[in-house]
Structures are given as C-alpha cells and as structure tokens.
UniProtKB/Swiss-Prot annotation:
Part of the 50S ribosomal subunit. Forms a cluster with proteins L14 and L19. One of its GO terms (molecular function) is structural constituent of ribosome. This is Large ribosomal subunit protein uL3. Disulfide bonds: none annotated. Belongs to the universal ribosomal protein uL3 family. One of its GO terms (biological process) is translation. Keywords: Ribonucleoprotein, Ribosomal protein, RNA-binding, rRNA-binding. One of the primary rRNA binding proteins, it binds directly near the 3'-end of the 23S rRNA, where it nucleates assembly of the 50S subunit. Signal peptide: none annotated. GO terms for cellular component: cytosolic large ribosomal subunit. InterPro entries: Ribosomal_uL3 (IPR000597), Ribosomal_uL3_bac/org-type (IPR019927), Ribosomal_uL3_CS (IPR019926), Transl_B-barrel_sf (IPR009000). The gene is rplC. It comes from Mesoplasma florum (strain ATCC 33453 / NBRC 100688 / NCTC 11704 / L1). It comes from the Bacteria.
Length: 238
C-alpha cells in the first residue's frame, strides 16, 4: 500500500487524448516528507508517517517540534500515517510521480463538508408530506416507530450532518505534473481541504474495466501489400 498527502484546489474539466471531456478535481500534492517509519518489531505494525505543507515553529508544541527535528524537517501542517507503507527512510522526500502514474486508480479520503444541524429530509432523503394548506405536516419526520414508549437506536432523525471522514474509491488519475494531480470525478471536502490519496484496494467496476481494456487495446495496423513476384521465362527456341 502506497499513498501521499495533498490538498484539494478546485474542480474543472479537461479533454483526454481521445477527445472525451471529463470532470476532474485538481489536487495540490507538494513533496511529502517522511517523518517516521513504524515497523512490526518496534511498533507492532507497519506504517509510514508523512507530512506536507510547512508551518511556523511557534504554532507547534515542544514534543511535536522534537519529532520534526528528528526527521530534519520543518513543522508540517498536515501529518498522517499510512498503514502497510514501507521501503522509505526518515527524512526523505517523495512526490506524486514517485508513487502514482497516469491511468492508475486511487482512493481519496477527506473530511466532507459540514452542513450543521439538518432535518430528516435533507439528511436522510426522506419524502416530504403534502404541501396543501389542510395537511398536518409538511417537512416533519412522521412516524418514528410502532412502540410508543421508546425509539430504537440508530433511528434516522434530524441531527448534525457532514464533517465526517469519507472515502471515494476507484478514481482515475488523469495527469500528474508540477506537483499537481488531476483525479477524475469529485473528492470529499471543500476547496483547500486536506486529502489522503492511496492506491485502490478494491477491483474496478465493469464500466471502468471496460474503459481500461479499450484504452490499453493494441492499435491494429494494416500490413503493406507486397507486389507478387513474376518470374521471367527465358525462351529456348531459336
């Protein structure tokens, strides 16, 4: 498992090599610094801690500053470890092109946009009631169960919506250039939100597999037609 940290910039659209217009998310992936390498013998599991985007020293406490100095690095704003990522040394720097390549599929994890306190219709896609003047309710939750003295746990009701960790899987990498990565489709979070990009863990859907098969199919070329060889007949008659 390999991954890298970045920051969402915006969404736009680009044309592919075959002329297809696809929506993409622009992700800023500055070089990541390896802050710590965890091994099975020392920590009980394998992981690599990454850091990206510099931060002033007066914004970190002494224990955090000591950890950054061990890696010969300045303080970082976004620090996260990725499990089962090994083969790197503390203090080294990696870029997006070292981890991924164009055409590869990745999983992107981020914090979704917060919506605040939302009703059941917005939060759980409930149907609203009749909107006529004689109806008893319009956007109410309605019945909450058949037992009158209690409400079951996990009942879908109004409450806090958004601002949770979400992962979008199997997104295609359209391009990587100059610390910028273009990922097909949308990713969680607002603009300038931090995201974690890792190699995909699940297989592709039928549509994605078909597109990949068509894109990697060899181009058929016609072989040149050779002219037939005409043997010269020598006459022996005088």
């Amino acid at each position: 498992m390999k991954g890298i940290l970045g920051r969402k910039v915006e969404m736009t659209q680009v044309f592919t090599a075959n002329g297809k217009l696809v929506p993409v998310t622009v992700v800023e992936v500055q070089p990541n610094t390896i802050l710590q390498v965890k091994t099975l013998e020392t920590n009980g599991y394998v992981a690599t801690q990454l850091g990206v985007f510099d931060k002033r020293e007066n914004l970190v406490n002494k224990p955090e500053l000591g950890q950054f100095k061990k890696a010969n690095s300045v303080p970082k704003r976004f620090v996260k470890e990725i499990r089962n990522m090994e083969g790197f040394e503390v203090g080294s720097v990696i870029s997006a092109s070292d981890i991924f390549e164009t055409g590869q599929y990745v999983d992107v994890t981020g914090i979704s946009k917060g919506k605040g306190f939302a009703g059941a219709i917005k939060r759980h896609n409930y149907s609203r009631g009749p909107m006529a003047h004689g109806s008893g309710y319009h956007r109410g939750i309605g019945s909450m169960g058949a037992i009158i003295n209690r409400i079951f746990k996990s009942k879908k009701m109004a409450g806090h919506m958004g601002h949770v960790k979400r992962t979008v899987q199997n997104l295609e990498v359209i391009a990587i250039d100059n610390n910028i990565m273009l990922v097909k489709g949308s990713i969680p979070g607002p603009n300038k939100g931090f995201v974690t990009i890792k190699a995909n863990v699940k297989g592709l859907s039928n549509t994605q597999a078909a597109e990949l098969l068509v894109r990697n199919a060899p181009v058929a070329t016609e072989a040149p037609i050779e002219a037939p060889v005409v043997e010269e007949v020598v006459s022996t008659e005088e």
